[in-house]
Every structure is written in C-alpha cells, then in structure tokens.
UniProtKB/Swiss-Prot annotation:
The keyword Mitochondrion applies. The modification N-acetylalanine is found at A2. Pfam families: adh_short. The gene is Hsdl1. NADP(+) binds at G74, A75, T76, D77, G78, I79, G80, D125, K222. It is found in: Mitochondrion. The keyword Mitochondrion applies. Transmembrane segments: none annotated. This is Inactive hydroxysteroid dehydrogenase-like protein 1. It comes from Rattus norvegicus (Rat).
Length: 330
C-alpha cells in the first residue's frame, strides 16, 4: 500500500507542477480551433448571403443599374445562351455573338418572342483572330452597352494529356479564351467609362483554382481570365464599372458534356438555365464568385485542400471522363 500511496502522491505532484503547461496547451488548442473555424463560419455566412438572400427579395433593375443593352459572346449554347435569356427576362435588349448564324437567329427569335425585347445577332468566329473585331466594334458603336458577358470559349474535346492535344485546339484556346475576352472588354469599356456605369462578366472555370492535369492549357487560359477580371475591377471600380469573375464548375451542357456520374447529380452540375438564374442574382454583389451555391461549396473545398489532393482528384475525374468519351467514340 505504501508503494501505491507513494505513486499516487508522485502523480499528484507531477500533475500540479504541469498544470500551467496543460493550460498553455489548452489555450494553443483553442486558438488553433478558432483560427480554423472562424474562416469556415465566415465562408458559410458569405455563401448564404450571396446565393440565397438576394433571391428572396425583389429583382434588381438591371437597366437602371447598368444600361439597356447586353452583349453576350458564345450565346448559342450552355451558360452563354442561358445567361442571355435570364438578362432578357430582366428587360434588357440582347446582342448575341457566335459563329453559327443559323443557331444565332433561332436563339434571337426565341428571346425576342418570349421576352419581348430587341435582339441583334453578330456572326463572328473568334478563332480567326484579329480580323473579326473591327466589324464588332462598328456594330456596337453608339449603343448603350450596359452589360458584357464574355462566355465564348474553346474546350478540349475531352480531358487529354497536353502532348495529345491538337495544335489547332491550342490556338483556339489562345484566340477564343484569352484574346476574345480581352478585346471585347477593350471595345465596350470606353463607353461604360463615359456613362459611368456598366458591368463586365467574364466566365472563367473552376479548373483555374489550382493546376489541373489533363486540362493544362484550358485551365491556364481560365486562370488568365480570372486574374484579368480581378485586376480590371481594381482599375475601374472607382469609375462606376462592376467587373465580375465568374468561376463555374461543371454544368450539364453540351459544351462541357460532363460524364454520366455528374448528370446523375444535378445539385453538383446544374442545368445552364438554373445556373444562369443564380449567377445573375450575384451581379453587383460579388466581384468573384462561382455563381451557384453547390459550386461555391466545391470552390471552398478546392481552396482549403492541399494541391496534391486537388491534382489526385482532378486526375481521377478526368481519366474517367476521357475513358467515357473514348468508349463512346469506339
């Protein structure tokens, strides 16, 4: 018993002498927990404030806020077409730009008949480079361009290793993804500055968050658009221009054609129409957003996860999408 009592007394003495260290470790643990938890709580609040609260109120008057006409590039498919329809539902006149005249005319007629707004179509193949911009500049001259949506984009046929990407596709990514957005902004921006109002929305991609294997050139071009938009916002916010970098993840579009798994999860990959309804509600509120609540959750995971985990997940998903695309071609 004496040995037991001696051990118990020794334990109490050690515990008493270490109590200050235990308290210090508890404080460090509390500080670390708060440091990790507070940003997550703030991000969750921002998600609710951005994606849900604005949709509870009345629709904003986009014509009064920005101007009467909206220009949308890449307007015959996917997000571009849906965004054009959503802006038309707010009463804006729509200028549609794409390379497929027949589809342009069909979309323009549908928008004009459905929403009773004016429409104008401009046929332009952005992959042809510099020569196409003079006619666009002339067509937009003296118009009250309130909103520009840069959605035109070139995409891989399916995820591929860079050495397997056709050279024409690489040039398309440079001319369509990078040059088109830059020059369209250069065309409409002077008029917006003169009127002291306007909005520029440039559609980037969730693949710009971190290096994305098997979409190397595409994700790099979208990273350019993200940085370009954010820099423009700093340059022109004081002049009344709102610039938004829109960073969607997958939508169920014929342009991106996600695999069957994503098509079975509409909350992960919404339809272009649902996506556009949510994205337009963030206009004037967030300078950099995914545009859709579940995409914002995916973006938060991407921001907080280590790069090696992102690369592993991207490789896993893109291998699956490539395998599915190749098997459908066989």
């Amino acid at each position: 018993m004496a040995a037991v009592d001696s051990f118990y007394l020794l334990y109490r003495e050690i515990a008493r002498s270490c109590s200050c260290y235990v308290e210090a470790l508890a404080l460090v643990g509390a500080w670390y927990t708060a440091r990790k938890s507070i940003p997550v709580i703030c991000d969750f609040y921002s998600l609710v404030r951005l994606h849900f609260i604005p949709r509870l109120g009345s629709r904003p008057d986009l014509i009064k806020q920005y101007g009467r006409w909206a220009v949308i590039s890449g307007a015959t498919d996917g997000i571009g077409k849906a965004y054009a329809e959503e802006l038309a539902s707010h009463g804006l006149n729509i200028i549609l730009i794409s390379q497929e005249e027949e589809k342009l005319q069909a979309v323009a007629k549908h928008i004009a008949d459905t929403y009773r707004v004016e429409t104008l179509v401009l046929v332009a193949d952005f992959s042809r480079g510099r020569e196409i911009y003079a006619p666009i500049r002339e067509a937009l001259r003296d118009r009250d361009i309130g909103i520009l949506v840069n959605d035109v984009g070139a995409f891989y046929p399916y995820p591929q290793y860079f050495s397997q990407v056709p050279e024409d596709t690489i040039w398309d990514i440079v001319n369509v993804n990078i040059a088109a957005a830059s020059l369209m902004v250069h065309i409409v921006l002077p008029g917006m500055v003169e009127r002291k109002k306007g909005a520029i929305v440039t559609v980037s991609s969730g693949s710009c968050c971190k290096p994305t294997p098997q979409l190397a050139a595409f994700s790099a071009s979208k990273a350019y658009l993200d940085h370009f938009s954010r820099a423009l916002q700093y340059e022109y916010a004081s002049k009344g221009i709102f610039v938004q970098s829109l960073i969607p993840f997958y939508v169920t579009s014929s342009v991106t054609a996600p695999g069957s798994f994503l098509r079975r999860c509409p909350w992960l990959a919404p339809s272009p129409r649902v996506y556009a309804q949510h994205a337009v509600s963030t206009l004037g509120i967030s300078k950099r957003t995914t545009g859709y609540w579940s995409h914002s959750i995916q973006f938060l995971f991407a921001q907080y996860m280590p790069e090696w985990l992102w690369v592993w997940g991207a490789n896993l998903l893109n291998r699956s999408l490539r395998k599915e695309a190749l098997s459908s071609q066989a």
